[in-house]
Swiss-Prot record:
Residues 56-79 are annotated as: Disordered. Glycans are attached at residue 45. This is Putative endoplasmic reticulum mannosidase MNL2. Belongs to the glycosyl hydrolase 47 family. The gene is MNL2. Its EC number is 3.2.1.-.
Length: 849
């Protein structure tokens, strides 16, 4: 009792002193914080002195241009008398590092110039520059009813082909023993992660090699995946995702070995570093040791590769119950949704986009104070070591014009069906399949109560554009579109709408029937071509005039679209009664045509498939007269019909977009701004393809904008009589004469067998297994002929063209994709059933929750 009284007495004596101490501490803290804010404001106004190597230690070999040690700090600071600002020499590495703390780099592409000076001790830890304040929540799937679960595979039994399975497993083990992946992984421990080993791990498990699988996992367990080995200067984020993260997840899903899941979390956490940008879009070529960490994503990136992480991150979020992985995916697809109308082809992204979302302010706009209005404008540093002001639009943009390219060419947008673009369609569909159509990644809507929580900062960050910038857009004749398409804050651009319109564009403008050496009755062979577009907005008519030029170059990667379309035909469309979608029968028909065309190509090239090739389009498709004639082609070449010129831009006829009389693409309203300039804004319209008109909204005049397509002259290869000798190519006698160009032939490619596998699993038709058996026979025969040695021995090697850099290692896609698809094609239908599993872009397996 006496102790309690003593404590109480002591408290009464010190409580006034304690209160004074707390008050003084708070006063000191806020005074110190105010000093920090003042220093930061100096930095924001360029009031800090330039820093050189005499003042700061810059140990480490900088990749930037070396500073001029003969000049002093005062020599590097000059006053700009016109605007009263201090011009800082950002080419000095130390100065650049200091300024980069406050101003992000805005670069066209990643390069070694961004530096690599971080001390080793700081590489394991990472503090985000742009942390997420409100994460999207991963949607719950617990309330999905059995009636909502769709079936991909047919109800019939799909029995195994035991003989083919044995042949494929034998080839896998021959390849595995030849490569000695376990030994190589240990020998290369200091220089790289065991990427090839991880990439082939799930196929090893499917082959039933339990002992080898456990040995492999034991080796992988010894690696630190929190950061890469120091020898790995630059990390290809899409490649690391598809081969390492997906490989670890897939092996975990099959074996349930939690060591693999822990390693997958480490890899994913490292990949998340690349998302630490002002708009949370990843840097794909990631220099992880650079001390210049404050960066926008690159201004020239392959559009589809921005979605590569989607499936792995979503599945990892489900497994770990951590929202940060799902949040990263949702923000990328939110930006895609905002960009659906930014480019010439609506609902399509070109090959290359500006991922920074930055619209640079002009000098006139800066002088008029536009850079001071709105939180969406950030002062940044470009690749020329100059300050620029970037207005963040929250969407992907056209990449900046290359000064070295022809002005005429740089005005075109390129759309191809290849590895740069297909992942967007593929991942949109497979995410929909993963969620069993209960959640839409584009519009953020869910059938469940636990839908993804919207980040309140999204949308509010992109403020209304200042009238000065609006004037510039109007004078330049560019269309001014809102980045939103919402009614009552609910998006009308969902995955179904995006996929439907994107595939419709492909069907209409990017498919062609080629001239082939032989035509089979009742067979229609089609390939997917590329297009170049150029547009001009006509304010007087409120039309976007888009000129389209077709180029009949084909990427072998486009053969994957056959399987993707086939899969999409088995998933019911999501949406209301007025939602437009492509009939499953049409999707299935096109998927069969593409897959059969690619298989025909494999036969014609004896398995040596060109990664890129160029064909002649059929000139008499109406009558079905598409058989190639070498004499006719030689005559056309002699007559100069294949001679082309850079500015050969003759246009053809105008065509409407979808259906009769064109398609009203987007409702608009004209709003008169303060200075009399008319601004065209988006009105929240109906779903794509609808002709519903909106007469009046909020008393504003409403007009309709529509795309008017003009078919320009086809782009042909430049061929003269000097390139031919009779009915064959002079410099490439091994090329078929019906093919105008062949690039990078490969033998072990997986694109065609992947589509054949999908077509069999969704239909159960034996013709697809027959194609698979034929293609495997062609592959084995070609391998033995090209790589035979003494005493009948032969090795498995990839084929490389003369002059190409030869890699003696087997490519890991041979294990992770090619052999896996062959194995699953001939396995029992319940083995990795598509009703319960999804195969990712990298060929890895994740479960549907």
């Amino acid at each position: 009792m006496s102790i309690a009284r003593l404590v109480y007495s002591l408290f009464r004596r010190v409580r006034s002193v304690l209160l004074l101490f707390i008050t003084i501490s708070l006063l000191f803290y806020y005074t110190f914080q105010n000093e920090i804010d003042i220093l930061n404001s100096y930095a924001l106004n360029d009031s800090l002195p330039s820093i050189n190597n005499y003042e700061h230690n810059t140990e480490g070999s900088s990749k930037l241009d070396p500073p001029d040690l003969s000049s002093t700090g005062s020599d590097r600071i000059a006053t700009d008398k016109e605007n009263g600002n201090v011009a800082v020499d950002l080419s000095d590495p130390a100065t650049l590092r200091e300024k980069n703390k406050y101003f992000p780099l805005l670069l066209k592409g990643s390069s070694h110039q961004i530096g690599s000076n971080l001390p080793i001790s700081s590489l394991l830890t990472y503090k985000e520059k742009y942390p997420v304040l409100f994460e999207y929540s991963s949607p719950s799937l617990t309330s999905i009813s059995q009636n909502d679960v769709h079936k991909i595979q047919p109800a019939m039994q799909l029995p195994p082909d035991v003989d083919m399975i044995k042949q494929i497993k034998d080839i896998f083990m021959k390849s595995w023993n030849q490569e000695q992946l376990l030994l190589k992984s240990n020998l290369r421990r200091e220089s790289t992660w065991p990427i090839d080993l991880i990439d082939s791990l799930d196929t090893l498990y499917l082959c039933g090699e339990t002992k080898l699988f456990q040995d492999s996992v034991n080796i992988i367990e010894d690696f630190d995946f929190r950061v890469p080995p120091l020898a790995m200067e630059v990390i290809d984020i899409p490649d690391i995702t598809t081969r390492v993260l997906e490989g670890l997840l897939s092996a975990y899903e099959l074996s349930m070995d939690k060591r693999l899941l822990n390693k997958a979390k480490h890899v994913a956490d490292f990949i998340l570093r690349s998302f630490d940008t002002p708009n949370r879009i990843p840097i794909l070529k990631y220099f992880w040791k650079s001390d210049l960490r404050n960066r926008f994503p690159d201004r020239t990136v392959p559009s589809g590769q921005l979605t590569t992480m989607a499936l792995a991150f979503i599945r990892l979020s489900q497994l770990t119950r951590l929202n940060k992985y799902f949040d990263a995916v949702e923000r990328v697809f939110t930006t895609i949704r905002q960009s659906y109308n930014e480019f010439d082809m609506e609902f399509m992204l070109p090959d290359v986009v500006d991922a920074s979302g930055c619209q640079l302010l002009t000098q006139e706009e800066i002088e008029n104070g536009a850079h001071l209005k709105g939180s969406s404008i950030m002062k940044s540093i470009n690749e020329n070591f100059k300050f620029v002001h970037c207005q963040q639009l929250g969407k992907f943009l056209n990449p900046p014009i290359d000064d070295n390219s022809l002005q005429e060419q740089s005005q075109y947008q390129a759309y191809r069906i290849n590895e740069k673009t297909v992942p967007i369609l593929e991942n949109l569909f497979k995410i929909n399949d993963l969620f069993q159509s209960s959640y839409d990644i584009l519009d953020g809507s869910s059938k469940n109560a636990n839908a993804a929580t919207m980040d309140p900062s999204i949308g509010s960050e992109v403020e209304a554009v200042d009238e000065i910038i609006e004037k510039r857009n109007f004078k330049d004749g560019t269309k001014k579109d809102s980045t939103k398409n919402t009614v009552g804050d609910k998006s009308l651009i969902d995955s179904q709408t995006f996929l439907t319109n994107s595939i419709s564009n492909i069907f209409k403008f990017m498919t062609f029937r080629p001239m082939l050496p032989k035509q089979t009755e009742n067979k229609k062979f089609n390939f997917l071509n590329s297009i170049l577009t150029k547009s001009q907005f006509m304010p007087t008519t409120n039309e976007l005039d888009v000129t389209i030029r077709k180029s009949y170059d084909v990427s072998l990667y486009s053969c994957r679209l056959g399987g993707i379309l086939g899969l999409s035909s088995r998933v019911p469309h999501r949406g209301g009664v007025n939602t437009k979608y492509i009939l499953p029968s049409s999707l299935l028909e096109m998927s069969e045509i593409i897959t059969e065309s690619c298989f025909m190509l494999m036969e014609e090239f004896d398995g040596l498939l060109p990664q890129k090739f160029e064909l002649d389009p059929c000139t008499d498709e109406t009558n079905g007269n598409c058989e190639f004639n070498g004499e006719t082609k030689s005559r056309m070449i002699a007559n100069g019909e294949y001679e082309t010129f850079e500015n050969d831009l003759d246009v053809g006829i105008k065509v409407s977009n979808y259906g009769k009389g064109g398609n009203d693409q987007k409702a608009k309203r004209n709003v008169l701004s303060k200075d009399g300039i008319t601004e065209t804004q988006n009105i929240k319209g109906d779903t794509v393809g609808s002709s519903k008109s909106i007469a009046e909204i909020d008393g504003d005049e409403v007009t309709q904008i529509r795309r008017v397509f003009t078919l320009g002259k086809d782009i042909k290869p430049h061929i003269t009589t000097d390139d031919t000798m009779g009915s064959q190519w002079k410099n490439h006698p091994d090329w078929p004469f019906w093919v105008n160009k062949v690039e990078s032939r490969r033998l072990l490619d997986s694109n065609i067998i992947e589509s054949i596998f999908y077509m069999y699993r969704i239909s159960g038709e034996q013709k697809w297994r027959s194609m698979g058996k034929q293609s495997f026979g062609i592959l084995m025969q070609e391998l033995m002929e090209l790589n035979s040695g003494a005493k009948g021995l032969w090795q498995i090697k990839e084929f490389y063209e003369n002059g190409e850099k030869v890699n003696n290692d087997l490519p890991s896609y041979w294990f992770s994709r090619t052999l896996k698809y062959y194995l699953l094609l001939f396995s029992d239908g319940d083995k990795v059933s598509l009703d319960k599993h999804i195969l990712t872009q990298g060929g890895h397996i994740i479960k549907k929750k």
